[in-house]
Design a protein with these regions (language model features):
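N-terminal helix initiation/capping motif
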Residues: 1-28, 34-39, 96-112
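Short coil/turn motifs at beta-sheet boundaries
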Residues: 2, 26, 43-45, 57, ...
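Short conserved beta-strand and strand-loop elements enriched in small hydrophobics
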Residues: 4-13, 44-60
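Beta-strand secondary-structure signal
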Residues: 8, 32, 49-51, 63-65, ...
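Short beta-strand-centered aromatic/proline hotspots
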Residues: 21, 62-68
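Residue-level recognition of beta-strand microenvironments
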Residues: 26, 67-71, 87
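Short, solvent-exposed secondary-structure boundary/capping segments
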Residues: 32-35, 70-83
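Extended Gly/Ser/Thr-rich low-complexity repeat segments
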Residues: 42-55, 92-104
Length: 112
């Protein structure tokens, strides 16, 4: 993601808790995010009720499969890497369009 771009993320039920966070890495197959929680999901765990709020578009609701999770002492948050489960084609397009726009902006402002 480009510097300054915020992609809020929330998980409706992580061990009984609604968790908010922010994506720092995004692709059509998965996401890296910082979450405001001390709860530690396990590798392979499926999280449902996930909402990803891409700028200037409707919120994207999905499920995630945790690939890694660890406490990040520098940010005092939980850092996760996860893959999307069961994205619809329209959701994949939504993410791909957002990422393409990010790339266009990056090229426009840093045309190396």
């Amino acid at each position: 993601l480009n510097p300054g771009v915020m992609v809020p993320l929330s998980i409706a039920n992580l061990e009984g808790e609604t968790v908010k966070g922010e994506a720092f890495d995004l692709s059509t197959s998965g996401v890296g995010a910082f979450l405001q929680t001390r709860k530690m999901p396990s590798r392979g765990q499926t999280l449902s009720g996930v909402t990803l709020s891409l700028p200037q578009t409707r919120p994207l609701k999905t499920k995630l499969e945790i690939r890694f999770a660890r406490q990040d002492s520098a940010h005092h948050m939980l850092r996760i890497g996860a893959r999307f489960i069961g994205l619809e084609r329209s959701q994949e397009r939504q993410i791909a369009q957002f990422l393409a726009e990010q790339q266009r902006k990056r090229r426009r402002y840093d045309p190396r």
